[in-house]
Structure formats: C-alpha cells, structure tokens
C-alpha cells in the first residue's frame, strides 16, 4: 500500500511463483487491469496476461528462452550454439540477425537483417579492440592496465579520414579527469540538380549531407573534470580549438541535491540557476539567478513521490502535468491540455506502446485513429485505441504518432528490437552486437540502414549512412543535455546510448524517466540505498552526481549504475556456469531450472561489479573454456573448483584497490545478508517442494548418487553464477574450497539422486568481511 492509498495485491502459488497482480485506488476500486501469470512444471513462465494482451514464452530442454510472443501476437525467436552463445535472433517479420564467436566466446561476426556484416577483433584479455562495419568505417579502442578506455578512433575505411577521436585520462580512483574529443561536424555540401540548372545554374537551393571525405569542419574540444570529497562532479572546463573557454560549475548539499549550476564563458557568467528542495529531496523550485525576482519554475509531487506538475512561471508557459500507472510508471505528459506523450507498459513494466505529439497526421488526428480492425486483445480491447483516446478533438488537436515496441527481454536490460506503426508496418528495427560501448550497432529504416558512432561514455556522437555519409553529429554536457546537433524523430538514442523523448526531453531508463536539465528523476527510486554512503539515500539524483563514470540503465540503485564494461565481468563468469549446465543430464532439468532461478535472485540482489574485475573474469573464461566439454569426472570438477578459487582470490585482491567502491559494496552486501539468505532458502525450499510433488517421498540417504550444484558467489562487486551437474563429492568439496576466501559470499547447493529420486538443499552463508 502506497502513501496515497493505492494498493497492489500479489498472489502466489505454493511454490512462491507470482500468479497475479491486482490494483486498487485509494477508494478500493479497481484502477487497472490485473496481470496474471502461468508456469510449466519446471517453474518457467509460459504466459503473462496484461493490458497489452497475452504474451507467451517457450523454452528449450536447458531452460533457455527460445520464443516470445507479444500481446499483439508478434514473435521473437532465439537460437543458441553448442557453447550456449546466442546464435541468432529472428524478428517478427521473419528477418534475422546472426552471431559468430571465437573459442573464447567473443563475438567476431555479426550479420544483420539485410545480410550486412560487422566484425570484431579482441586482444589477449578478450577486450574489443576493433569494430569494422559493412560501410567500411572502423572503430579502434585502446585500454590502460586498469582496463579503462584510453582512446577511441573512428575512421572511414574508403577515404581513410578520421571521423572522430576520443582520448581519456583517469585519476587513481579510476575516475575520468581529462578528455580530448576531435570530431567532424555533420554538414552539407552544395550539389547541382536538374532544378538548379533550370534556374540558370543556381546551386544554392538544394544540398545533401557531405560524406566523410568531403566533410571539412573539424572540432577539437578538451575537457577537464573536478570532483568533491564525495566524488560528485563539481566542475567541467572545456576549450574548443580557436573558441571560448567554458566552465560549468555545480554545487550540492550534504545529501546530494544540486543547489546551483553556473556557466561561465571566458570569465563572464552567462547563466546561473539555483535549486530548492523539500525534506524528501524533491526539487520544488528552480530560479534564474540572472533575473532579479525571477518567479522560477516550480515542481509539485503526489503522495507517492511522483512529479505531477511543472510550472515555468518565468516564461508564463502552460503547466506541464504528469500522470502515472498504479506502479508509478510515467503514463501521460500534457501541456495546456495537449498530450505530449503517453505510454503503456506490460506486466513486467516494459514500455510496449507510446503515443507522441509529432504534428504528423499519419496515425491519428483529434478523435480519429487509424488502427487495423484486427489489432485487439483476447478480451476485445485495443491498447492503441486506449492510448489514442487520450487525444481530444477541437482546436487543440494535433497530429499524433502511435508506436508499438517489440522488446528483446533476453538481455540484461530490455532493449527495443523493432518499432511498429499503427498500420502494423515496421518503422525501424535495431541490431545489437558486442555488449559495452557501441552495443546498439545500427538502425534499419525503410529507406536504408544507419550506423551509430560512440564516445567512451557510450553516448551516440555520430550517425553514418550505408555509404559512410555523416548525417548527424552530437555533443552533450556532463549530465546529458544535448549541446550540439539536432534530435530527429519522436525518440532518439543519444546520451549513454539511451532513448530520449524529443517532446518532453525525458530519457527513458526503463523503471524511471530522467530529466537531464535538472539532473533528477521524475519519480523516486524504489531502492533505499545504503547507510554508509548517504548519497545513495537520495532517491531522485542521477548516479550520485557522478555521471561521467556511472550510468543508470535500469533507473534503479547505485550498483546498476556501473557501466556495461564492468558488468561484462559478471556476465562472463556467469556464462561459465551456463556451459557446465549444458553438460548435465537433461533428466534433471527441473532441478537445474530452479537452481538457476535462485542464482538469478542473488545476481539481481547484488549487481555491483568492480571495474578491475573484468580482466580476471575474462581470464576465467579462458580457463573454463579448456574443460568445457570434458566435465565428466570428479577429478575434472576438482580442477575447475581449484581454478575458480584462484580466480575469485585474484578478483578479491583487485577490487580492494578501488577503495570507496569496495567499502560501499561491503556495506551494501552486509545490509542485505538477511535478505539474500531468505531468498536463497526460499528458492532451495521451492526446489525440494517441486521435486517432492513430482517424485514423491524424499530419500535423504541417496544424496551421493548424482548431484546438481549451484554456487552463487558475490566477491566485493563480482557476481559469479555457476550451475552444473556435479558429482555429490565434487559439490561438497567445492563449498569449503570457495568458502574460505574471507569475502562477501553466498553459496547454495541442491544435491540430488536420480535413481532413488531424492534431493537435499544445502545453504552456506558467511558474513561479509
């Protein structure tokens, strides 16, 4: 029950699987359509019914998701290779992208929907060093000994010209303190057309975008960054070659609220804003210090902590209002009675439909909506019509665009695979490659494909055509405001590679929307933070005011803010366990799936990953690769356990060097030890109950026959999930081998016997040191 009186009720089955979510308003009346779930005998979700329709899910014998059907009956399929790598994704229209890997499971070749190829090269530590696209452009990446990106160079393969270069310097804590960016600016060149010659050779009327070879304007910008004792960004000083020196100053209070921002050009103050907050750290007023007596912009919130109104009194603008779902997801943004943006989410709170004010009459105008008659859910409702009903006719009616998002949920963070219009045609589709910098490779539109270029923060800085024409170039300030370039379309992918809505200026970060202008979210974080670091207790600030070194792709807690290069460490080691699972006997599928579910719970609870762990994680992948398909004896498992312990020790030693991050993580784990314990116990008990239901009486004496082991170890910022079909002796030997590391650790093992059908849950939890 929320402060406003809104209530969400959760109903579970006897195995603790969520069956239903229902919503009531403060009066106790149903406020939204219930969400219902169904599962198979292995505990895998097979369907979800919500306001967007009924979604269904299919799995293979190893519990990997192979097909997702959306509420609008659009299918996305997944294919895997023998090493458990994702081999292909099939889109709803039948097109597909395919992946090829080297012996270390590094992605080396990506073939997109149009059969265009992107290739990758890696160094000895399995880090991406080179990306070559089908249009001939190439990206080269360099690293230092601490795994920081030191240089990114984007070049045109056909002409050899450098499109952009980004160089970075770091302090002892691993934070960026210097940056040099050299970039071509997307522009135009004069080209004669038939109309030009008809008009007596006037070549001034029509232009097209210049390709890299003919692009002349190059901009070099140097930036330095300063931080306070809490590692909050306090100053950015930038100097464009031949241009002005610009200083951006930020100040904060003790809890991390921004109190002022000032922009100074060549020593002259050009802009200054002051910020005021209430006791809940909610921004309630922003004033322009350059305007005497400025009434400013005021902000109002509901009882649940959601921003509901923004009034720009300085410019006497119409108020902007915000409305939310029962689970506090942004639903509608209006200004002066006109809908700017509206969104609809599925039962997992993934954005599925969106209505945007574009002044284009392609989908709806006033009360008239162009939607195919067959686009209805099982109960006769049309999600698109529900969104379109928000548009009012009359003098304020504008043109609106309806978009359906087909999401890839088989990723760490849900990403959009394709966008459909109300006419059920694909507007654009996206291709994803190697995780980390530049993960979103290209966008495929009806006319042609375009390729994204990125800087070291994973922000989109350029867009190239198939012929290497630079059509767009972008620059951002530290908090994500677009300072150079023009945003195209309804939503564009820019700062940190995430989607920003053009009309509202809000960036969609899945659980919440981010306002780059103020450096705050529109809703409070559901994560409470840690007691050790007060800045994590601020539930509205962005990345604890350290946006250069952290991102927040989920809209949640500090540990999900660590950039993807660090997260790759956890993902790499996690895949080791998945490979061992694939060698296990399929007859124990039920236990494996339930064990994997427990591991996932721990991983989601403790997501912090120290950057210095990546190299060790990659090394561990190579170690495990050599025995991937030969895990058949106890001696082999003992070798794996030994090497795994060595890996964990190396990670433990490495992360202790990063000081504050390591200390904060220990506190985070310590506060959640009880939570982790209860979750592990719950899932292990669920395993026992599930097996008991299927196979009858448990024979505790048969535990030595065959075993399934799961070890989920969190080591100061590294989450390792390894699930495998181990012999009972190997499991028992593995626990003490991994338990004496003196670091935050959670390990669980489900040991079973197939012949006599018995299973035992073992839980070992040691407190963080």
Name each model feature, range by range.
Residues 1-2, 6-50, 54-70, 74-91, ...:
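Beta-strand elements of repeat-based all-beta scaffolds
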Residues 272-275, 427-430, 442-511, 517, ...:
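A motif-centric feature for acidic-aromatic and gly/ser/thr-rich catalytic loops and repeats
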Residues 531-534:
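Short linker/helix segments within small regulatory modules
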Residues 538, 545-546, 551-555, 564-568, ...:
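Membrane-active amphipathic alpha-helices
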Residues 760-769:
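Residue-level detector of conserved catalytic or cofactor/ligand-binding positions
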């Amino acid at each position: 029950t929320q402060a406003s009186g809104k209530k969400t009720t959760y109903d579970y089955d006897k195995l603790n699987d969520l069956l239903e979510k229902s919503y009531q308003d403060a009066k106790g009346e149903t406020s939204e359509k219930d969400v219902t779930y169904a599962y198979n005998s292995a505990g895998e979700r097979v369907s979800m019914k919500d306001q967007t329709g009924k979604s269904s899910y299919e799995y293979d014998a190893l519990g990997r998701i192979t097909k997702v059907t959306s509420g609008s009956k659009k299918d996305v399929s997944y294919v895997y290779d023998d090493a458990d790598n994702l081999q292909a994704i099939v889109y709803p229209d039948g097109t597909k992208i395919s992946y090829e890997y080297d012996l270390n499971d590094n992605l080396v070749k990506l073939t997109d929907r149009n059969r265009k190829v992107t290739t990758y090269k890696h160094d000895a530590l399995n880090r991406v060093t080179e990306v070559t696209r089908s249009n001939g452009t190439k990206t080269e990446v360099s690293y230092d000994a601490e795994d920081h990106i030191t240089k990114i160079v984007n070049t045109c393969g056909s002409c050899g010209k450098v499109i952009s270069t980004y160089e970075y310097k770091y302090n002892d804590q691993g934070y960026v303190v210097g940056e040099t960016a050299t970039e071509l600016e997307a522009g135009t060149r004069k080209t004669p057309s038939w109309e030009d010659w008809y008009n007596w050779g006037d070549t001034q009327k029509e232009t097209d975008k210049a390709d890299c070879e003919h692009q002349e304007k190059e901009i070099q910008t140097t930036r330095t960054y300063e931080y306070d004792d809490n590692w909050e960004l306090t100053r950015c000083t930038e100097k464009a070659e031949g241009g002005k020196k610009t200083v951006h100053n930020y100040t904060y209070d003790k809890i991390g609220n921004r109190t002022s921002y000032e922009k100074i050009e060549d020593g002259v103050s050009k802009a200054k804003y002051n910020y005021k907050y209430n006791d809940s750290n909610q921004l309630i007023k922003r004033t322009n210090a350059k305007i005497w007596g400025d009434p400013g912009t005021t902000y109002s919130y509901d009882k649940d902590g959601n921003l509901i109104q923004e009034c720009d009194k300085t410019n006497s603008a119409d108020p902007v209002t915000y409305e939310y779902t029962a689970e506090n997801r942004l639903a509608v943004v209006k200004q002066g009675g006109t809908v700017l943006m509206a969104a609809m989410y599925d039962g997992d709170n993934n954005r599925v439909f969106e209505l945007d004010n574009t002044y284009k009459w392609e989908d709806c105008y006033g009360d008239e909506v162009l939607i195919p008659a067959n686009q209805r859910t099982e109960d006769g409702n049309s999600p698109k019509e529900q969104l379109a009903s928000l548009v009012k006719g009359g003098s304020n009616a504008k043109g609106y665009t309806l978009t359906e998002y087909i999401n890839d949920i088989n990723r760490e963070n849900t990403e959009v695979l394709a966008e459909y219009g109300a006419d059920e045609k694909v507007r654009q589709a996206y291709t994803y490659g190697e995780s980390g910098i530049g993960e979103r490779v290209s966008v495929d539109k009806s006319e042609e494909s375009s390729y994204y270029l990125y800087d070291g923060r994973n922000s989109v800085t350029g867009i190239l055509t198939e012929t290497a024409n630079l059509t767009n170039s972008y620059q951002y300030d530290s908090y994500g405001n677009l300072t150079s370039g023009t945003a195209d379309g309804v939503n564009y992918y820019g700062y940190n590679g995430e989607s920003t809505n053009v009309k509202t200026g809000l960036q969609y970060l899945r659980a919440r929307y981010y306002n780059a202008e103020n450096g705050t979210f529109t809703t409070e974080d559901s994560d409470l933070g840690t007691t050790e670091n007060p800045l994590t207790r601020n539930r509205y600030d962005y990345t604890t005011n350290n946006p250069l070194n952290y991102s927040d792709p989920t809209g949640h807690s500090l540990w999900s803010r660590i950039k993807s290069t660090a997260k790759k460490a956890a993902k790499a080691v996690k895949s080791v366990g998945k490979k061992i699972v694939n060698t296990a006997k399929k007859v124990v599928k039920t236990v494996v799936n339930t064990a994997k579910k427990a591991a996932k719970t721990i991983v989601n609870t403790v997501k912090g990953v120290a950057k210095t762990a990546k190299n060790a994680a990659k090394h561990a992948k190579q170690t495990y690769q050599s025995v991937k398909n030969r895990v058949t004896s106890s001696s082999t498992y003992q070798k794996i356990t030994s090497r795994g312990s060595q890996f964990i020790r190396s990670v433990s030693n490495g992360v202790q060097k990063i000081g504050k991050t390591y200390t904060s993580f220990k506190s985070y784990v310590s506060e959640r030890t009880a939570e982790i314990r209860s979750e592990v116990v719950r899932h292990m008990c669920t395993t026992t109950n599930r097996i008991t239901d299927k196979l009858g009486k448990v024979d505790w004496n048969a535990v030595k026959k065959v075993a399934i082991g799961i070890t989920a170890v969190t080591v100061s910022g590294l989450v390792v999930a390894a699930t495998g079909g181990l012999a009972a002796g190997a499991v028992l030997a593995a626990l003490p081998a991994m338990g004496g590391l003196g670091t935050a650790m959670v390990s669980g093992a489900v040991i079973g016997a197939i012949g006599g059908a018995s299973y035992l849950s073992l839980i070992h939890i040691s407190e963080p040191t």
